[in-house]
């Protein structure tokens, strides 16, 4: 998979419909879950096919291998949201979907997301400076961005400590 910059990832998610955004976001999140597993278990790729772990199992393995447990809930909800779209092609993203994902974040991650968005909104003179007042698509995009960033950081920390 091509490594996208943060801006490219944001743009990729922004140009998709609900289905495309959720599926594409999930693919990129799972990519970083796999990268974390490979860094934590250098032989993981050799046995990954035999292990045949689904996304949920991979996220649990990540937590067992040192990924902050604060990400367990949000990562699980990303998988459930992806499954809703995969198994119900006409499914539409709801406010509740996004609210539940946001609520699954730790208080620290919620505050980080709000502060980061506010700073960006001021910097780029966005009309809406409050995360909570954004639409579902915009909030989900930022939630994907946050989770991807947390996984990338955890992956980098594993590599630094190796």
What positions do the PLM features span?
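Amphipathic alpha-helical interface elements
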Residues: 1-162
């Amino acid at each position: 998979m091509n490594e996208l910059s943060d801006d490219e990832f944001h743009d990729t998610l922004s140009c998709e419909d609900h289905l495309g955004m959720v599926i594409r976001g999930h693919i990129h999140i799972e990519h970083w879950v796999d990268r974390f597993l490979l860094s934590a278990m250098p032989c993981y790729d050799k046995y990954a096919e035999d292990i045949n772990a689904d996304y949920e199992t991979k996220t649990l393995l990540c937590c067992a291998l040192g990924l902050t447990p604060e990400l367990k809930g949000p990562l699980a909800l990303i998988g459930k949201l992806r499954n809703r779209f995969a198994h119900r092609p006409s499914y539409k993203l709801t406010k509740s979907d996004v609210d539940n994902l946001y609520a699954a974040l730790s208080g620290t991650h919620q505050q980080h997301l709000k502060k980061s968005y506010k700073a960006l909104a001021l910097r780029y003179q966005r009309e809406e400076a409050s995360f909570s007042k954004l639409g579902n698509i915009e909030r989900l995009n930022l939630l994907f961005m946050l989770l991807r960033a947390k996984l990338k950081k955890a992956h980098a920390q594993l590599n630094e400590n190796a």
